[in-house]
Design a protein with these regions (language model features):
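A residue-level marker of the well-folded mature domains of exported/periplasmic proteins
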Residues: 154, 171-176, 180-181, 190-195, ...
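Secondary-structure end/capping motifs
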Residues: 222-269
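Second-shell loop/turn segments in exported
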Residues: 30, 130-135, 178, 216-220, ...
């Protein structure tokens, strides 16, 4: 799944080479924002790869429920670097956030879906008309839903949007307070293995872009080369999902608080 990060190096070079003030030395600190589903980041954190590579830098890790909350923290200076889906940066920049794109991942069309109950009468996206759909506002799932509706000949006004964080959306979906749930992994894999759900639509035909790595502009301008090295370290962490798959699944299951079969399915997506 995360072969994607092997391509971040080039993206990082292209993005960071334009930052004329990039420094070769490691800075005093780096505050990293990550999500539960950030496999490469979670592995890098668990194995302390950054701490070992840059012993003079103090690293702090802050977990966020979704991209919008992470980028808000990045904008106000609470963190220096983060990774998020395709749409949150657009919302953040529209609100005036001074962020820099420093890396990109290819799209993962099977890792984000619209779910309905297994016995739901909703059989196709067009059937969502008039129904309640839960999702995190401003997230990549928001984008997935918009693109799916457009493909089906519907508009956003044709559904009843219910803006919820992943955890709250899962509860609402399980309690049948909403009719569908647009969500990403590992929440998707967890729901799938729990049973009682059906994938209405994934991103295969929707031409979505991948996730992005973003940094606060002041930090990136001073530490461009260092950020490139950090992304390279994340790529090394990602490689562990291939070279040490069983160990990585066990570690991710422990740190994410999810069963190993959920993690295995997540990586397959």
């Amino acid at each position: 799944m995360f072969k994607i990060l092997s391509r971040i190096g080039l993206a990082g070079v292209l993005a960071l080479s334009s930052l004329s003030h990039a420094a070769e030395t490691s800075p005093e600190s780096l505050r990293i924002g990550y999500q539960k589903g950030s496999v490469s980041m979670v592995l890098a954190k668990s194995h302390q790869l950054l701490e070992k590579r840059f012993p003079t830098t103090t690293f702090s890790w802050v977990e966020f429920p979704a991209g919008p909350q992470m980028l808000e923290a990045l904008n106000v200076g609470s963190i220096d670097l983060g990774s998020t889906g395709d749409i949150p940066p657009i919302f953040a920049q529209a609100a005036g956030a001074d962020l820099v794109y420093v890396g990109v991942e290819p799209a993962k069309p099977k890792a984000e879906v619209i779910l309905v109950a297994e016995n739901s009468a909703i059989k196709r996206v067009a059937d969502l008309k008039g129904h309640k759909v839960a999702f995190q506002k401003g997230s990549s799932s928001h984008n997935l839903l918009l693109r799916a509706l457009q493909e089906a000949g519907l508009t956003f006004k044709d559904i009843q949007p219910v803006y919820l964080t992943p955890a709250d959306a899962r509860a609402a979906f399980q309690q049948k307070n909403v009719d569908a749930w647009a969500i990403w992994d590992p929440y998707y894999s967890a729901a799938l293995l729990q049973g009682g759900v059906r994938v209405l639509k994934d991103g295969t035909t929707l031409k979505q872009t991948g996730s992005f790595y973003l940094a606060a502009r002041p930090y990136a301008e001073k530490n461009g080369a260092f950020i490139q090295s950090v992304l390279d370290t994340f790529s090394q962490a990602d490689a562990l999902t291939q070279s040490q798959r069983p160990e990585s699944i066990a570690l991710l299951a422990k740190t994410m608080g999810l069963p190993e079969p959920v993690i295995a399915t997540y990586l397959d997506h």
